Regions:
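Short secondary-structure junctions
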Residues: 2-11, 60-64
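Structured mid-to-C-terminal alpha-helical surface segments
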Residues: 183-244
């Protein structure tokens, strides 16, 4: 499907994320990074996103497909590296309703590409073209840190994580790990690492989030309103101290 829509400009396809590093968990996405030699126009972008809905299922849906997350970048926008870099297209299940209603996100400058490309360079499989470590330049530590800081800035009040508590808690664990080590770890690995560094009052929440992610316990973080808010505040403050 990707080749059918982008064949004329397709440079590389890299599989990364849980499928390569740590193994797929019950709700894990299939993460793909696609590089093209020229930015797709609006009609091509929209046609591809509509088709991708056919090979992706919402998390926990029990459908034939796993959730798909696909990012498309133009080679000239990321090689040589610059920050923030431009993202041509992003597809994910959180966009399904918008896509079906005819709302398509345009190309944007994306701070998160600094994290994504670092992740792909560390752990990925080239499905087309050279390895990510060969194709992409290293992201400078300064830009990686800025992207981490930019990411945590979005979580300030309960409304920012309501309905997505587990993912936000685990994302903060990964960011804490990355800010401290410069590396990117699977969610469960980062959560275990963080749990060893947390005050006792925050450990039950991170352990619960990790167990729910692994599928060994039910996800009840939505019921743990105060615990979640306290963890977010503590984790953010710790990460900010590390990054400054």
């Amino acid at each position: 499907m990707i080749e059918r829509h982008l064949a004329a400009t397709l440079d590389t396809i890299h599989l990364f994320g849980s499928a390569i590093d740590g193994g797929l968990k019950p709700d894990s996405d299939i993460d793909l990074l696609v590089t093209v030699s020229a930015a797709p126009n609006d009609s091509l972008r929209q046609a591809l996103m509509l088709d991708l809905l056919k090979v992706s299922s919402p998390p926990g849906d029990g459908g034939t497909w796993r959730p798909l997350e696909l990012t498309v970048v133009a080679r000239s926008e990321v090689v040589p590296w610059r920050y923030p870099a431009r993202r041509e297209l992003q597809f994910g299940e959180w966009l399904r309703h918008d896509i079906l209603s005819g709302t398509f996100e345009p190309a944007v400058l994306d701070h998160d590409l600094a994290i994504l490309l670092t992740k792909a360079r560390q752990h990925s499989l080239a499905l087309l073209g050279p390895s990510a470590a060969t194709f992409f330049e290293p992201v400078p530590k300064e830009h990686f840190s800025k992207a981490l800081f930019y990411t945590i800035a979005q979580w300030n009040a309960e409304s920012d994580w309501k309905g997505d508590e587990r993912n936000v808690v685990l994302a903060l664990a990964r960011i804490w790990y990355s800010a401290s080590t410069g590396l990117i770890a699977p969610k469960d690995v980062a959560a275990a690492w963080v749990s060893e560094r947390l005050p006792a009052e925050h450990r039950p929440l991170i352990c619960k989030a990790r167990a729910a992610y692994l599928g060994s316990e039910d996800d009840d973080l939505a019921m743990r309103v105060e615990e979640t808010a306290a963890f977010v505040r503590y984790a953010k403050a710790t990460i900010e101290r590390i990054l400054r």
